[in-house]
Amino acid sequence: MSALNWKPFVYGGLASITAECGTFPIDLTKTRLQIQGQTNDAKFREIRYRGMLHALMRIGREEGLRALYSGIAPAMLRQASYGTIKIGTYQSLKRLAVERPEDETLLINVVCGILSGVISSAIANPTDVLKIRMQAQNSAVQGGMIGNFISIYQQEGTRGLWKGVSLTAQRAAIVVGVELPVYDITKKHLILSGLMGDTVSTHFLSSFTCGLVGALASNPVDVVRTRMMNQRDLRDGRCSGYKGTLDCLLQTWKNEGFFALYKGFWPNWLRLGPWNIIFFLTYEQLKKLDL
């Protein structure tokens, strides 16, 4: 077995941070849309936003443009850990399974994607909780990243930092298990068919496709995960709303209808689409560097 290749880890982290910075305001609107309208949480019961564009304009007008980047620090920290581990582990697992990229199959890539998604998301979960809590605040973020981190730990303990970890792992298994294999297989078939070469156009089309498929597959889990992470669970055992993952899913469906599970779909897709395009274009260019 060849030595571990460090390049996918570094390139994956750099490309992930670049993509996160370019699409973060869309991600923030997705979070705001997903947490509103909860009948069992008075703080988020009001329907403040009619859609993604309305959310962007209202947040910018009422809270200032800086509010559109509330939570960017933990988001970048998350990508530095999650993105680095995800891509590096995925590429490493593929090389363990088969030596040559040409021998890869959809099944191998899906299994490698699921495993890398679960591992990386579990490790990076505290930064995800922190990002969502900061995004959910309807005013200027108080205390910054460190202050919010300390606040979560003091009020909820270590468990608070890993709140929703099972959902995060499930979502990552779906997203990574779908997006990376779809990108690889789409790119492979476009090149082998002779329709396109290994060019920016191929990378663009492949990344657009995987972003759409990933958004469709992951949105219901993402809604439940966002609500669970945003929920306060105090040290004395009191909980502000949902009893667990299944309860959150059922209450959301029962109280708000099935399509509530697709709240935030448009910003989710409009984020995942550009996010994947920026990520893969950056990643493919970094791969060409002679290091």
Curated annotation (Swiss-Prot):
Domain of life: Eukaryota
Keyword Transport: yes
GO cellular component: mitochondrial inner membrane; mitochondrion
Main location: mitochondrion
Keywords: Acetylation, Membrane, Mitochondrion, Mitochondrion inner membrane, Repeat, Transmembrane, Transmembrane helix, Transport
Stated role: Antiporter that transports inorganic anions (sulfate, sulfite, thiosulfate and phosphate) and, to a lesser extent, a variety of dicarboxylates (e.g. malonate, malate and citramalate) and, even more so, aspartate. The sulfate/sulfate exchange is much higher than the phosphate/phosphate and malate/malate exchanges. The transport affinities is higher for sulfate and thiosulfate than for any other substrate. May catalyze the export of sulfite and thiosulfate (the hydrogen sulfide degradation products) from the mitochondria, thereby modulating the level of the hydrogen sulfide.
Protein name per Swiss-Prot or TrEMBL: Kidney mitochondrial carrier protein 1
